[in-house]
Regions:
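Cofactor-binding active-site loop characterized by glycine-rich and histidine/acidic residues
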Residues: 1-88, 258, 262-263, 271-272
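Non-catalytic terminal/interface segments that mediate subunit docking, oligomerization
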Residues: 6, 203-316, 324-330, 411-412, ...
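A glycine-rich helix N-cap at a beta->alpha junction
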Residues: 12-22, 86-104, 122-125, 283, ...
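Active-site nucleophile and cofactor-binding loops and adjacent substrate-binding regions
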Residues: 17, 26-45, 68-72, 175-177, ...
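A short, small-residue-rich loop immediately preceding and capping a beta-strand
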Residues: 36-37, 60-75, 92-95, 258-261, ...
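Long, well-ordered, tryptophan-enriched scaffold segments
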Residues: 99-244
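Glycine-/acidic-rich phosphate or pyrophosphate-binding loops and their flanking alpha/beta elements
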Residues: 185-188, 220-221, 239-254, 270-276, ...
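Peripheral docking tails and interdomain loops at the edges
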Residues: 225-236, 345-347, 366-367, 488, ...
Length: 507
């Protein structure tokens, strides 16, 4: 947000994270100062290294700077990039914004490593000063090299080593990120380096605003709020996420095999209460979706009942693990609670969960359940844990439920719930699933008022659609079929239905 204010978009903040307003993330179409799309963590060093290589190959001269948070450093992609950058020797500046937070509190061994680095600024200042002194005298560079070898041995025993130095980076810092003069000085020093350099900046999330300092997790990606109270404007207190978390706690209280896994999103996925009630069965792996999926597979193989809660947009990162570690074996009963499925609104294009139907449908043996309301979410979670032998994905949206609150999951012999048409023959059939059933029913009412005979088909289980619909719909299809869904066209339910009905010569 500070970057956007400094680059001419201050006046646009009245429409932050709104339709036709400015994005909460980097967006090149907004400004030439946004170098790339940004929304998912851990990728900045990779993109920056690519830009640095392009600069060198094309013979240009400019600095490339990647900014990455300590939370994003819990993602494996960041280490792939750091490893490659350090080995390449390509001049590149990486600014590590270390505020000990991602969205929730940071976790993992790296977080502890950074904590050690934070407490040794005296060593870093002394090291920098010694290089400046010896570098200014004749033969000083040889002295520095000699001292460095001794220094490394002493440091390895007495002081925490810097992982970044071991990976080939010049390590500068830590420096107080709220001291503008100190930050400017260390960045000028970094610009003089001719090799990969990491600047370690210590900041406090929400610095200078009491409410944000006291509750940093609540001020991640904020929309409008009252600055005098720190409270956001009204939102539904009961959401699919909260119902999921509540239901999982109830089930876990009765079954010690149930575990919860999340990738740095315990509060966002509704698992905060689970983490406090069942701390030994709660696993926050950091921003590491691939690891979360594969670890869940391992848990399931050894008799546990893992429920891995991940946003739809972030589960894309674990696609290979869903296939290789979960689905191929066929009998791994791991449950994936896919939050923020469909259009997410304020979070923008990078966070829309519109690809999950396409990529999940392509995985053999994976059951995909789509609750339309809270009651169905509860029923489907129970079914996934106790009535399925393989992997199950439960897909649900951001926010609360709509007007349709009936639990249509009582008869699992069929994945279809069909409304009774108001007329003997329906000329139009609307097919939908999940939260979009509310829009389908509204459309049916509007069309019926116009004298158009409509029936609505609600799909509870996407993975079984081909088997059930291809038979039933042949006998009761209207002349026109609409499929209403919030997903990309390629690989969507509508494409599946059109293909299956065409194969059966129904259309």
């Amino acid at each position: 947000y500070v970057h956007k204010i400094l680059t001419g978009r201050k006046a646009d903040f009245d429409h932050l994270r709104q339709f036709h307003g400015i994005s909460g993330f980097l967006r090149p179409e907004e400004s030439i100062t946004d170098p790339c799309i940004s929304g998912h963590a851990s990728n900045s060093v990779s993109i920056a290294l690519g830009m640095a290589h392009a600069r060198t190959i094309r013979g240009h001269k400019y600095h490339v700077v990647a900014v990455i948070g300590d939370g994003a450093l819990s993602g494996g992609m960041a280490y792939e990039a750091l490893n490659s950058a350090g080995d390449s020797g390509e001049p590149l500046i990486v600014v590590l914004n270390d505020n000990n937070m991602s969205i929730d509190q940071n976790v993992g061994a790296l977080s502890r490593h950074l904590a050690k680095l934070r407490i040794s600024p005296r060593y870093m200042r002394a090291k920098t000063r010694a290089k400046q002194i010896f570098g200014a005298i004749p033969g000083g560079k040889n002295i520095i090299r000699g001292i460095s070898s001794i220094n490394s041995a002493v440091k390895s025993v007495l002081l925490p080593s810097s992982l970044f130095e071991e990976m080939g980076f010049v390590y500068l810092g830590p420096v107080d990120g709220h001291d503008i003069k100190a930050v400017c000085e260390i960045l000028q020093l970094a610009k003089r380096m001719k090799r990969p350099t990491l600047v370690h900046v210590i900041t406090k999330k929400g610095k200078g605003y009491q409410f944000a300092e006291e509750h940093p997790d609540a001020f991640h990606g904020v929309s409008k709020f009252n600055p005098f109270t720190g409270q956001g404007y009204s939102k539904s207190s009961t959401t699919f996420s909260s119902i999921f978390g509540q239901t999982l706690c109830e089930l876990a209280a009765k079954d010690g095999r149930i575990c919860a896994v999340t990738a740095a999103m315990p509060s966002g996925t509704g698992l905060s209460d689970f983490s406090t009630q069942f701390p030994t069965r709660f696993f926050d792996v950091g921003i590491a979706e691939e690891h979360a999926v594969a670890m869940s597979a391992g848990m399931a193989k050894q008799g546990l009942k893992p429920v891995c809660a991940i946003y739809s947009t972030f589960l894309q990162r674990g696609y290979d693990q869903l296939i290789h570690d979960v689905a191929i074996e066929g009998n791994i009963n791991a449950v994936f609670a896919i939050d923020r499925a469909g259009i997410v609104g304020a979070d923008g294009a990078t966070h829309n969960g519109v690809f999950d139907i396409a990529y999940l449908r392509s995985i053999p043996g994976l059951t995909i359940l789509c609750p339309s309301n809270f009651a169905e979410l509860k029923s489907m979670l129970t079914r996934a844990l106790y009535h399925e032998s393989g992997a199950v994905a439960i897909r649900y949206p951001r926010g609360g439920q709509g007007n349709f609150t009936a639990d249509t999951t009582a008869n699992w012999a069929s994945c279809i719930y069909k409304t009774s048409p108001k007329h003997e023959f329906a000329s139009v059939t609307i097919v939908s699933y999940g939260i979009m059933i509310n829009e389908a029913l509204l459309a049916a009412d509007l069309l019926s008022d116009l004298g158009i005979h409509v029936q609505v088909w609600k799909i509870n289980e996407i993975s079984e659609t081909y088997r059930f619909l291809s038979d039933e719909m042949r006998h009761s299809l209207g002349n026109t079929v609409y499929v209403l869904e919030d997903a990309v066209c390629n690989g969507c339910l509508g494409e599946c239905l059109a293909s299956s009905l065409q194969d059966d010569h129904t259309i």
